[in-house]
């Protein structure tokens, strides 16, 4: 029985030792974030609640610039109800596929990792809802399809409970 428990524990620990992003290491085309987020981009997206119901749609015009390992991505959102929002990301290429991101509504620092054609971000966003601000965790996955197109799917949660998903389609102009 002790051997069975030890084997089960070892199997569980080894399954936890590799990052989920590593499964994409061989996927092509390889994502060069500084190249993709350089220049003008356009995106279309939506938010769905945890039941899958469509809550909000939006369009985003973006401009990215890089100087060495430092980048800036200016995002201008227009939501389906006519409201507008701007977010400015300050990005840092830390090397070895690691990125950091900061924005005014991001609590702390977003941590990103690239493997193959996939980027996974983890961050907490201060999200205003009906006059209150909630800190919501994002598990954000970006999938490069070709040098002009990317699909982004982010899961939002609070206290470990899924709130919904954001889906975006990016196109370089």
Say what each PLM segment does.
Residues 44, 48-129:
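Central antiparallel beta-sheet cores of small beta-barrel/beta-sandwich binding domains
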Residues 2-7:
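Sec-dependent signal peptide recognition
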Residues 37-46, 152:
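A short, Trp-centered hydrophobic/proline-enriched beta-strand micro-motif
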Residues 24-40:
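N-terminal helix-cap/turn-to-beta initiation motif at the start of protein domains
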Residues 139-173:
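Glycine-rich, aromatic-bearing surface loops/beta-hairpins
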Residues 22, 60, 66, 140, ...:
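Sequence-level preference for short, compositionally simple segments enriched
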Residues 12-15:
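C-terminal motif of bacterial Sec signal peptides marking the signal peptidase cleavage site
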Residues 17-19:
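Bacterial signal peptide processing site
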